Amino acid sequence: NDFSQEVIMQLFVSAPNELANVNDVYLRYNGADDVFLPDAIPAQWVVDMYEDDDIRKNVYFTNDETVRISGLEYSDIWIVNKYPGNPELFTAANTNYQQAPKVFRVAEMYLISAESALNIPGGDALTPLNALRQARGLDAVSVSGDALQTAVRDERFRELAFEGFRLDDLKRWDEGFTRRDPQNEMLLLQGENTFTKSVEAS
């Protein structure tokens, strides 16, 4: 459902006539065949960013479903489940991916506070960082300097994944990105008449 004590601003939606635009690229459930047809599947490093004790791992992802890619079916593939839809807004038996858009959340404010503190001499980035980590079932960290900056940026990635922040964050930090290995190389789609990767993953 859409209830959360961490939401600061959430837009109103109501079935059947006042619904939001939806995002189904991560799931695309096919009820007739009981399979998922996602347009995007996270690379292995993305899944590995979440510890098993991190409550977000089994909220943001699922690997209990059958995934069909180019006519082939796979199991034990982690797919993004961050936008499964609110059953109260469904207009049929299966999900329509409808849920109320969350514009501002407390977690983002903690991350902004932590990142801002990194740029203030004597600023305390650890307190908001660890408050968020502990709220997600993780242990507090005790780091400083470059390690603290990395910890804050990694936590921002974990919390806000698949919400559209990543490219802006990388540009703001003047960082690039590296192509990495998929969960299963068989999931790579054919392009340019070849199954050979044009750029090796690292």
Residue ranges and their predicted role:
Residues N1-V25, V35-L37, Y50-S202:
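Acidic/polar-rich alpha-helix caps and helix-coil junctions
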Residues N30-Q44:
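Short, cationic low-complexity segments
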